[in-house]
């Protein structure tokens, strides 16, 4: 099952230029890629201009000498419904804040604010609780590293006890 997401840019008029992404919408997927690869207004604008996505990749443009279409796409390259699949009416849309929260059945919503920081919300569980994406990913990494350290300690203790 897909983890769907909306990707948006806060506009000066108070609205949000928004596209849909069908796959890997969780913070360690789409969130991490947005934070590391689409961290400037210019890069995000280029992404939004592609319209709705099947897959968000680290790169926008495919190698023109290789196939890049649905079920045969280039790894780490964004797969856009309009450009790569041939679907119609997939362009970015402008939403008010209220409409953004109700725009789709997305699991997560990511917004690059006017201040240049990525924020996100779990639209299914807490749609009005926004978190700083960078801080949240850092916390998840630290928690994961701590858990791995605990597992290594348990494994070492188990080896010591069995000797």
Where are the language model's segments positioned?
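Short acidic-glycine loop/turn motifs at beta-strand connectors
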Residues: 10-15, 112-116
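Low-complexity intrinsically disordered segments
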Residues: 37-152
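Aromatic side chains
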Residues: 16, 20, 108-110
């Amino acid at each position: 099952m897909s983890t769907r997401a909306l990707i948006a840019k806060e506009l000066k008029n108070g609205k949000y230029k928004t596209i849909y992404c069908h796959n890997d919408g969780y913070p360690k997927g789409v969130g991490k890629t947005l934070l590391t690869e689409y961290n400037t207004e210019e890069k995000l604008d280029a992404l939004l201009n592609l319209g709705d996505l099947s897959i968000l990749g680290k790169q926008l443009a495919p190698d023109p000498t290789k196939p890049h279409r649905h079920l045969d796409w280039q790894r780490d390259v964004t797969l856009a419904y309009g450009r790569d699949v041939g679907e119609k009416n997939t362009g970015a849309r402008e939403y008010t804040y209220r409409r953004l929260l109700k725009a789709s059945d997305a699991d997560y919503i990511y917004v690059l604010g006017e201040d240049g920081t990525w924020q996100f919300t779990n639209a299914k569980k807490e749609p009005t609780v926004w978190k700083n994406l960078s801080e949240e990913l850092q916390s998840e990494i630290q928690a994961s590293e701590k858990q791995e350290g605990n597992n290594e300690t348990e494994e070492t203790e188990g080896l010591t006890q069995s000797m």
